[in-house]
């Protein structure tokens, strides 16, 4: 209020029912994107429980929007909307997005973009603007200002592509997927990359850098492999799989803003999770060479060593802390910003 902000977009930290964003008792609109199983210690272990928490942002008389959800989750969202005396609208995927070069990679981002369009249109209508998209009409037209915003949007660490300045033929594909649903989306996205260069498979080295320190890491790794195998028809999607902790640098340790307070220090120091992942990947894909390393910096260096002079595609996924650390190290070493 002191800064006289005209429009603010606030994202919940975890959940919604008990989130600090509820300090705003009368927002102009609320939105829920695609739900997945995450933060189960606080939100519960079922999609219905998570939906209940997420719907905690709904406010009386304030328009509420949601992406398509599992039927059981959608039922909970509607029940919660009724409790809060508001109407919940399920947002369609807008056909006009097919003509937009969205600034974010990944087909699933079209769903997120649709929710953003609906929430934005509702907010702008309250501010007195006209000629806005109709949130309930999947064939609604998008004004030029909406198209420009969608094309210029950037989100680091989500379906992000970065060239490696140290090696001309090396490219980093970075996505912070860390739930079964989001890791599947990351796998599908990378599968499209693999398909584009499938004719040159013999000359392309594909490397995985993966970690997930606090969730069921083995299940996430298997989901990633199975998604890629199904999408590409190749049961050996990576020549090398590197498992490292989220520790940023070999000598300096964590960069301050990349520290996770939810990890077990002993597990990190002994590489417990990484060794378990290495064993799991040996069972998933015995043909891949598996590497266990202590830090992100060392994982990046190993990937460059393994690349030799081949065309190399490196997928980094499994953890937002891992992704943040990889971007930090790459940028500190002068590797390029993201490309479209």
Residue spans of the language-model regions?
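Short, flexible loop segments at boundaries between secondary-structure elements
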Residues: 38, 246-249, 336-340
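Short glycine/serine/threonine/alanine-rich loop segments
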Residues: 62, 84-88, 113
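C-terminal helical cap/extension that packs against the catalytic core
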Residues: 70-85, 89, 169-172, 225-313
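Active-site-proximal loop/hinge segments that shape catalytic or ion-binding/gating pockets
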Residues: 319
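Active-site-adjacent alpha-helix immediately C-terminal to a catalytic or transition-state-stabilizing loop
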Residues: 324-339
